[in-house]
Amino acid sequence: ADLMIDLEGLGTGPDTTILTIAAQSFDPLGNGYNERFYYARIDLESQEARSIQQDTIDWWATQPAAARDEAFNEADRIPLDQALDELGKIIWQSKRIWAQGPTYDMNILEHAYKSYSKPLPWMFYVVRDSRTVFGLWPELPKPPTSHHALEDCRRQIDMLQLTLRHLNVKELS
């Protein structure tokens, strides 16, 4: 199975502080997603060396209350290094790793793994960009982004599967 990854953070650079990490297993040529998923709220104190951008804090202030509450809720937060270990176990079991855009989620995760001197749990050639696929179908209906990492993973999976069906894709390499 493939894996869709999404995270929410406090900036756009590779060293940004991570609020939440989500990963959802799925078949890109199927419908819906599998039961295997990962979701974690990350402890901010475990990320003191990571950056925070004021413009992103300001942006979060404009988001719906539900998105802010999920991203900043203090309940059940775990240290970043623990989340990376848990996420890595799921990533290694996946055929391809998808994220929306080539420069945000995976760059931040790569920086995080390297900052803890942890090996990357993926090979460079398995990373895929869902946004590029969406661009092949300009009329693709795009539901709004919730900025809840797991909900966004699932929305991106739905859009990816819909686009691949629309394009009559029968096989992925």
Where on the chain are the PLM-derived regions?
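Conserved non-catalytic scaffold segment of RNase H-like nuclease domains
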Residues: L3, E8-A99
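Acidic active-site catalytic centers that drive phospho-/nucleotidyl reactions
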Residues: D6-E8, D105, D129, D152
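Short alpha-helical "patches" and their helix-cap loops
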Residues: F37-I42, P121-F124, L172-S173
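Pocket-edge positions in alpha/beta enzyme catalytic cores
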Residues: F72-A75, Y125, T145-H148
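Acidic, Mg2+-coordinating catalytic module of metal-dependent nucleases/exonucleases
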Residues: R96-P102, N107-I108, A112, P138-S173
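Short, flexible loop segments at boundaries between secondary-structure elements
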Residues: P121-K142
